[in-house]
Amino acid sequence: VYIHHMLVPSEPQPNDAIEDLRTFVAGRRFGAILADPPWQFQNRTGKVAPEHRRLARYSTLALSQIKELPVAHAAAPVCHLYLWVPNALLPDGLEVMKSWGFHYKSNIIWHKIRKDGGSDGRGVGFYFRNVTEILLFGVRGKHARTLAPGRTQVNYMSSRKREHSRKPDEQYQLIESCSKGPFLELFARGNRAKWGSWGNQADQYIPDWPTYSNHSQNETPLFSKVLQ
């Protein structure tokens, strides 16, 4: 069954998100969970500050709100977690993983490249110009090793950056080959066959603001809206 669910696209309320996720899961358990939370950045004064102008167009959640999400209720006894985290928030990502009941094991690095294959230097960063993002990998339960393809899968992906915050589609094939299903994506930006999708952009991801030339608005849609 393909699962689709949408939060009301407004400023997120932690209690609403918690109950919404509980309702969505409804007793189901997933063998692999992919999450791309709307992390909240702070500037050097400690005030909430977008890392980039485009971030102002997205609602974000505080670290405490992300940690409170009942992800453990969606996890099978043996489960893999793939958790996206910006470089600057790596400690927060590890903290979230622990709060959700998973043990950190490894990571996969996404290298954002230009059309010519060079590093895409349009990223941001106070100390260095970021051209990578981190996909943390954690497990829960016994005998939670990756499937056979994972033994030869390198922990690296490279692809062109598209609209803001969108992650590479290569992630899905990697996860499907290395982890057992059923599969669940949290804070999803599209529907995919064999995956449950939860998030306020889960039906589609078409930006209505100027963005990179190779964004998905210029592509044939990858996902169709499928209701349970």
List where the protein language model places each region.
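Class I S-adenosyl-L-methionine-dependent methyltransferase catalytic core
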Residues: 1-228
